[in-house]
Design a protein with these regions (language model features):
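Bacterial N-terminal signal peptides
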Residues: 9-18
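A structural signal for short loop-to-beta-strand junctions that line the ligand-binding cleft
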Residues: 98-117, 140, 218, 222-225
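Flexible hinge/capping segments at coil-to-helix
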Residues: 120-138
Length: 294
């Protein structure tokens, strides 16, 4: 009996101590206003795990869609949170009348910027873009169907070679078109698909400086208005007290050094938010660029 009582007392003490330890941790949940599959779900869980490693009490709150997320934000749950949103998602939310206002208080910091790339087939000889274009009067460029026809006009003016867009639905089909020899070049997001496809050679990115030995587009095409464009995601604040905002912003920026997030960003050469000056301005600029193509 004595042993049983000791075990019960020990268990109660452990439970109480655990509760106190948890209570000492600052709370910062991660809401995910999307399906439980795909990139947003994976990133949300990745971030929550990293926040726990950093010393936060963090849980994933699956709100599933924008309207639910907006309703969650209006409640006093007692648990501050963040969610990650891209410029494209922001525009889509607005178009569906699910308005989640971005202010200086709710825009915490940029999570990352994913860059664009331009590629050729790897079996084609390539030294520089100038040599590749030499002697050509026209080149075709595989790109997503959502881009406007005139996106490459300034490239044509700069190089004297006409860049003609060929539309495809999805990056997988863009690559297929290039590999099949249907186009001379391709222009798309720089993801693990592009990096991992050995039949293509992605020779440049829209990063502001050289990454992975690739000369930046701002050097190859200095007059092109999209030479530094890319997909930007930011952290949006959900009911974070005013006196905690500065600390949360600093901690979110430091997540780029987390043991899981750092390699996640590095494998596709994404630029972490902590390395981006004027993150809000960069995000707003990306929104403007997307809207100008519609």
């Amino acid at each position: 009996m004595t042993t049983k009582i000791k075990a019960i007392v020990f268990s109660m003490m452990f439970s109480v101590l655990s509760t106190f330890a948890l209570a000492d941790k600052p709370i910062l949940d991660v809401t995910i206003p999307s399906s439980s599959s795909g990139n947003s779900w994976a990133e949300g869980n990745l971030l929550s795990d990293a926040l726990n490693r950093m010393g936060y009490d963090s849980k994933v709150v699956h709100t599933k869609k924008c309207v639910n997320n907006l309703n969650y934000m209006s409640k006093d749950t007692g648990r501050p949170a963040v969610f990650v949103r891209s410029a494209k998602r922001y525009i889509k939310d607005e178009s569906r009348d699910c308005k989640v206002e971005i202010t200086d208080r709710t825009f915490l910091t940029v999570f990352y910027k994913r860059h664009q790339t331009m590629c050729i087939r790897s079996d084609k000889p390539f030294t520089t873009i100038s040599n590749f274009l030499k002697g050509k009067s026209r080149v075709t460029v595989a790109s997503t169907h959502s881009l406007p026809d005139g996106i490459f006009n300034s490239l044509s003016q700069q190089t004297g070679v006409k860049f003609v867009r060929v539309s495809y639905k999805g990056s997988k089909n863009i690559i297929k078109g290039l590999v099949a020899g249907d186009t001379d070049l391709m222009y798309s997001g720089f993801t693990k698909r592009e990096i991992g496809t050995d039949t293509i050679n992605c020779f440049t990115t829209s990063a502001s400086k050289e990454v992975g030995g690739r000369v930046p587009m701002n050097k190859l095409f200095p007059n092109w208005h999209l030479n530094e464009t890319g997909s930007v995601k930011y952290f949006h604040a959900v009911n974070i007290p005013e006196d905690r905002l500065a600390k949360v912003k600093a901690d979110l920026a430091e997540l780029a050094n987390d043991i899981k997030i750092k390699p996640y960003l590095a494998k596709t050469f994404m630029t972490p938010g902590k390395d981006i000056a004027n993150g809000r301005k960069v995000f707003d600029s990306h929104v403007t660029t997307i809207l100008s193509t519609k």
